[in-house]
UniProtKB/Swiss-Prot annotation:
Zinc phosphodiesterase, which displays some tRNA 3'-processing endonuclease activity. Probably involved in tRNA maturation, by removing a 3'-trailer from precursor tRNA. The lineage of its organism: Bacteria, Bacillati, Bacillota, Bacilli, Lactobacillales. This is Ribonuclease Z. Homodimer. The active site is at D67. CDD domains: RNaseZ_ZiPD-like_MBL-fold. Its EC number is 3.1.26.11. The gene is rnz. InterPro entries: Metallo-B-lactamas, RibonucZ/Hydroxyglut_hydro, RNase_Z/BN. One of its GO terms (molecular function) is zinc ion binding. It catalyses: Endonucleolytic cleavage of RNA, removing extra 3' nucleotides from tRNA precursor, generating 3' termini of tRNAs. A 3'-hydroxy group is left at the tRNA terminus and a 5'-phosphoryl group is left at the trailer molecule. Zn(2+) 2 binds at D67, H68, D216, H274.
Amino acid sequence: MEIQFLGTGAGQPAKARNVSSLVLKLLDEINEVWMFDCGEGTQRQILETTIKPRKVKKIFITHMHGDHVFGLPGFLSSRAFQANEEQTDLDIYGPVGIKSFVMTALRTSGSRLPYRIHFHEFDESSLGKIMETDKFTVYAEKLDHTIFCMGYRVVQKDLEGTLDAEALKLAGVPFGPLFGKVKNGENVTLEDGREIIAKDYISEPKKGKVITILGDTRKTDASIRLALGADVLVHESTYGKGDERIAKSHGHSTNMQAADIAKQANAKRLLLNHVSARFMGRDCWQMEEDAKTIFSNTHLVRDLEEVGI
């Protein structure tokens, strides 16, 4: 499981940072890639990676500002060129209006897609648990921005314990159907009368990962709730230390506010993104160092950077 950042800038493309988009790579878990936001130029950024557009099965949009959605029609069209290899439908989750935006762009440009898009639109009254599969659950909550904006909490369900096959073999259990029964948690009786207790040969379930990905937001308690105990919190850092007033007026956060959210939520790691173009080079280093004074496990990410979870 990895996060790769396709765009880490704020507002408009810059030389060092494209606008917002990241992918959550779940290839080992479910052979899928999930995209979060799709700003202008996202498909160009993908060309610099190993990401296959047809592997992108779900797209989560935080809000309808252009730097988070203007790349979506282009990406969907480019994805169509690979659809003949593997016909794969796509789910798009986002605020009310995302369907109209996408369909209008495709219709007016005469674009035809050889796959279906399933839209899931939300307003403030329909948030909470928005998606569930056998391996993942996704929650959404309203943040505090200048327009309706969501944050997402991706929860991996606990992983089953693994079978200690070597110990089972040493106990005299023949490989075959009995192995399968023990793996499924069933106690078995051997021909010599000994009972094999399944739980003695299966490790404890492994806790699933929690990944919190927030859209643009002022400092808000909703961010804390979404990030409670998260393994990774991705939080915007449009402004730096001392910029709290201007951040609030524009519906954004500073690096220090993001660090405080991570601390209050008891998150394990904080990744800062959505950085204003006025922060470059040493300024970015200082932004990260300042945040570390509040939350030590902080990192300010760069475009195309991959982070393991």
